[in-house]
Amino acid sequence: MLKRRHVLSMKDFSREEIDEILETAESLEPYARGKGSDILEGKILALMFFEPSTRTRMSFETAMKRLGGKTINLGSAEASSIAKGESLADTIRVVGGYADAIVIRHPKEGSARLAAEFSPVPVLNAGDGAGHHPTQTLLDLYTIKKESHLDDLSIALVGDLKYGRTVHSLAYALSLYGADIYLVSPPTLRMPEQIIGDLSRMGTRVREVSDLREVIKEVDVLYITRIQRERFPDPVEYNRVARSYSITIRDLEGVKPELRIMHPLPRVDEISPSVDETEHAVYFRQSFYGVPVRMALLKMILED
């Protein structure tokens, strides 16, 4: 179903396709934990990261190696011919000749789709500015499936909903599962109107609030995001909203016992470390789930 296919946006996937990816990820979880595999032996994955990354870069690299493949890295833009003025299109054409697939993270929205236009091999979007982050969304859905439930879910997306690409992608995907979505943010960091409009047209129930206390006792999942400092054109505005939400043990009094707290990481001040040891915290398991999910994508796209 995904053979030789680009992974650019969650809007490109049906629920049936997502379910197949999640089922494949579950079957690969033992391999993600160390069981050997050689199904992608001889395949090469190119990692092109023009923005900082820890989890996405390392989990893709781990996923490829767990499947018996290898990776090559661009390094930084400053250390490549891009620093000499080479266009992204030309760089993609060249790298596509060295690898069987390309993972790209870039600060400009639409960059992954542009890369796909010129690439001779499949392109996987690892984040394009404030646009989309589909592989993060797939691991988020896998986490929700493992730790809670996907159907009839009540979820609060909290924090920077304007610049946070993870919540943009996740909102679209959740609409396929009939979720009730609460959007919790400062007024200046609201979810873009286009996305809210798209969700409404898809029949998704969406409610916007600024006070997390209004919804924290009602939801099954809290999806917390950091304020995206690097996206702010004005540092004064960033400082004004930087500590808008910070979850502590006290905030969890009276919540559902089965509440699960997620975060795409890295966190800054959004979740107190005291929450880490509660039954509600699943964000470190969430980070691990990136390995089997990305293994599933690579297997489905590249396996002969």
Curated annotation (Swiss-Prot):
<dbReference type="InterPro" id="IPR006132">
    <property type="entry name" value="Asp/Orn_carbamoyltranf_P-bd"/>
</dbReference>
<keyword id="KW-0808">Transferase</keyword>
<feature type="binding site">
    <location>
        <position position="136"/>
    </location>
    <ligand>
        <name>carbamoyl phosphate</name>
    </ligand>
</feature>
<dbReference type="InterPro" id="IPR002082">
    <property type="entry name" value="Asp_carbamoyltransf"/>
</dbReference>
<dbReference type="InterPro" id="IPR006130">
    <property type="entry name" value="Asp/Orn_carbamoylTrfase"/>
</dbReference>
<dbReference type="GO" id="GO:0004070">
    <property type="term" value="F:aspartate carbamoyltransferase activity"/>
</dbReference>
<dbReference type="InterPro" id="IPR006131">
    <property type="entry name" value="Asp_carbamoyltransf_Asp/Orn-bd"/>
</dbReference>
<dbReference type="GO" id="GO:0006520">
    <property type="term" value="P:amino acid metabolic process"/>
</dbReference>
<feature type="binding site">
    <location>
        <position position="105"/>
    </location>
    <ligand>
        <name>carbamoyl phosphate</name>
    </ligand>
</feature>
<feature type="binding site">
    <location>
        <position position="165"/>
    </location>
    <ligand>
        <name>L-aspartate</name>
    </ligand>
</feature>
<feature type="binding site">
    <location>
        <position position="226"/>
    </location>
    <ligand>
        <name>L-aspartate</name>
    </ligand>
</feature>
<keyword id="KW-0665">Pyrimidine biosynthesis</keyword>
<feature type="binding site">
    <location>
        <position position="266"/>
    </location>
    <ligand>
        <name>carbamoyl phosphate</name>
    </ligand>
</feature>
<comment type="subunit">
    <text>Heterooligomer of catalytic and regulatory chains.</text>
</comment>
<comment type="function">
    <text>Catalyzes the condensation of carbamoyl phosphate and aspartate to form carbamoyl aspartate and inorganic phosphate, the committed step in the de novo pyrimidine nucleotide biosynthesis pathway.</text>
</comment>
<feature type="binding site">
    <location>
        <position position="265"/>
    </location>
    <ligand>
        <name>carbamoyl phosphate</name>
    </ligand>
</feature>
<feature type="binding site">
    <location>
        <position position="133"/>
    </location>
    <ligand>
        <name>carbamoyl phosphate</name>
    </ligand>
</feature>
<dbReference type="GO" id="GO:0016597">
    <property type="term" value="F:amino acid binding"/>
</dbReference>
<dbReference type="GO" id="GO:0005829">
    <property type="term" value="C:cytosol"/>
</dbReference>
<dbReference type="InterPro" id="IPR036901">
    <property type="entry name" value="Asp/Orn_carbamoylTrfase_sf"/>
</dbReference>
<feature type="binding site">
    <location>
        <position position="56"/>
    </location>
    <ligand>
        <name>carbamoyl phosphate</name>
    </ligand>
</feature>
<dbReference type="GO" id="GO:0044205">
    <property type="term" value="P:'de novo' UMP biosynthetic process"/>
</dbReference>
<dbReference type="Pfam" id="PF00185">
    <property type="entry name" value="OTCace"/>
</dbReference>
<feature type="binding site">
    <location>
        <position position="55"/>
    </location>
    <ligand>
        <name>carbamoyl phosphate</name>
    </ligand>
</feature>
<feature type="binding site">
    <location>
        <position position="84"/>
    </location>
    <ligand>
        <name>L-aspartate</name>
    </ligand>
</feature>
<dbReference type="GO" id="GO:0006207">
    <property type="term" value="P:'de novo' pyrimidine nucleobase biosynthetic process"/>
</dbReference>
<comment type="pathway">
    <text>Pyrimidine metabolism; UMP biosynthesis via de novo pathway; (S)-dihydroorotate from bicarbonate: step 2/3.</text>
</comment>
<protein>
    <recommendedName>
        <fullName>Aspartate carbamoyltransferase catalytic subunit</fullName>
        <ecNumber>2.1.3.2</ecNumber>
    </recommendedName>
</protein>
<comment type="similarity">
    <text>Belongs to the aspartate/ornithine carbamoyltransferase superfamily. ATCase family.</text>
</comment>
<dbReference type="Pfam" id="PF02729">
    <property type="entry name" value="OTCace_N"/>
</dbReference>
